[in-house]
């Protein structure tokens, strides 16, 4: 007897009704990742510069961060998101561009906070580059 195929049904994304949430922008020297969450921290939508097709050194540009923020904002606004608190982490070039893009997409920014981890003289940093 031939084995019957089990048909997998993909779970449909349920539309959450969240009006206020948080936007976490991680901007490194190599990439920018924007995650939009609800008040508890559960992710509603996210996007990264690399995931949008930017490769190599173009991932670290402010334009790539702007596009990532715009894409994530549009996806989160489908869940009813209207206002966000922005938490920025990292030293990358796309920090300000991503914040401006969230505002331009129609989200009201209520708070901007820098949460970049700063060591109290922890690990030894990598050696200086000589170019």
Swiss-Prot record:
It holds the Pfam family Ribosomal_S11. Part of the 30S ribosomal subunit. Interacts with proteins S7 and S18. Binds to IF-3. InterPro entries: Ribosomal_uS11 (IPR001971), Ribosomal_uS11_bac-type (IPR019981), Ribosomal_uS11_CS (IPR018102), Ribosomal_uS11_sf (IPR036967). The lineage of its organism: Bacteria, Bacillati, Bacillota, Clostridia, Eubacteriales. One of its GO terms (biological process) is translation. One of its GO terms (molecular function) is rRNA binding. One of its GO terms (cellular component) is ribonucleoprotein complex. This is Small ribosomal subunit protein uS11.
